[in-house]
Amino acid sequence: MIKLKIKTGDIVRVIAGDHKGAEGKVVKVDREKNKAIVEGVNMVSKHTKPSAKSPQGGIVKKEAPIQISNVSLIDPKTKEATRVGIRVEGDKKVRFSKKSNQVL
């Protein structure tokens, strides 16, 4: 498992693939598979049978995971895609934007 620099709640932009240019909030990060679920990106149709949970059944749209390498964090200051660095401030590790050098 590698150290991921994208966390749940971050605003990211898709930089490669079918959904290139789309932006959204990270809902979930799967560290073992190096994938993230981004709100409103990579929507798939899931066919569900009627059950106690959903008596109607039918087709449900939901987000599918996307590779972490295909997303880039958006810098809150410049609103552009940026790389993320990690540095030690005091006795804590903090993430910072490589473009604006601002702590995230």
UniProtKB/Swiss-Prot annotation:
GO BP: translation
Ranges that cross the membrane: none
Superkingdom, natural source: Bacteria
CDD domains in the cross-refs: KOW_RPL26
Keyword Ribonucleoprotein recorded: yes
UniProt cross-references to SMART domains, sorted A to Z: KOW
Keywords from the named record: Ribonucleoprotein, Ribosomal protein, RNA-binding, rRNA-binding
PROSITE patterns (alphabetical): RIBOSOMAL_L24
UniProt-listed Pfam families: KOW (PF00467), ribosomal_L24 (PF17136)
GO molecular function annotation: rRNA binding; structural constituent of ribosome
GO cellular component terms, semicolon-separated: ribonucleoprotein complex; ribosome
Assembly with partners or alone: Part of the 50S ribosomal subunit.
Entry function: One of two assembly initiator proteins, it binds directly to the 5'-end of the 23S rRNA, where it nucleates assembly of the 50S subunit.
Family: Belongs to the universal ribosomal protein uL24 family.
Name of the protein in question: Large ribosomal subunit protein uL24
